[in-house]
């Protein structure tokens, strides 16, 4: 409704651009903006998580490319989105700690998506992302998957569960991080 009434055009024009950006790919069934909105419903009502979902794909319109068959790709959107989220959150006067955590989650929300992890990979990921952010990142990744098309959803969720299980085992073993 805020988009349709042009409210977001005033305070979050980046979102309007996302609403107008198609995702022509088997993994997606919505525009970027529609996917963002859908993803919000898959995280708890936590400020950091909701902001991370609002911004997790905000960089996609800036990096979109398309194959000759029309399939869209968004390489590097995590880093671009994190920089955009930082600017937006400064503009909207969010506190620095919230902005830093949200930007970290945005930057790394696709980290390890194609990797079948072992404990060493989990330790490396936690060291890169931060132990304070890792469990939140798993929630962001789950919401992202749930808001995508059904294509390979079960496989993606199984892989994510493995990341989570190995993380919990590493913490229990005192290996993190």
Predicted regions span which residues?
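Short Gly/Pro-enriched turn/cap motifs at secondary-structure boundaries
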Residues: 27-30
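Proline-centered turn/helix-capping motifs that create local helix->coil transitions or kinks
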Residues: 2-13
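C-terminal subdomains that position terminal phosphate/3'-OH groups for nucleotidyl transfer/ligation
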Residues: 17-18, 25, 35-38, 42-177
């Amino acid at each position: 409704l805020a988009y349709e009434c042009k409210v977001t055009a005033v305070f979050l024009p980046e979102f309007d651009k996302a609403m107008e950006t198609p995702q022509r790919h088997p993994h997606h069934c919505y525009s970027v903006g529609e996917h963002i909105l859908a993803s919000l419903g898959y995280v708890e009502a936590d400020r950091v998580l909701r902001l991370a979902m609002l911004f997790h794909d905000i960089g996609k319109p800036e990096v979109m490319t398309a194959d000759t068959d029309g399939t869209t790709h968004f390489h590097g959107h995590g880093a671009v989105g994190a920089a955009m989220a930082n600017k937006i959150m400064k503009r909207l006067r969010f506190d620095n700690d919230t902005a830093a955590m949200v930007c970290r989650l945005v930057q790394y929300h696709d980290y390890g998506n194609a990797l079948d992890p072992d404990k060493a990979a989990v330790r490396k990921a936690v060291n890169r992302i931060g132990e304070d952010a890792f469990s939140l990142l798993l929630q962001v990744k789950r919401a992202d998957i749930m808001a995508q098309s059904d294509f390979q959803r079960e496989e993606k969720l199984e892989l994510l569960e493995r990341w989570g299980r190995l993380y919990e085992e590493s913490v229990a073993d005192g290996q993190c991080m």
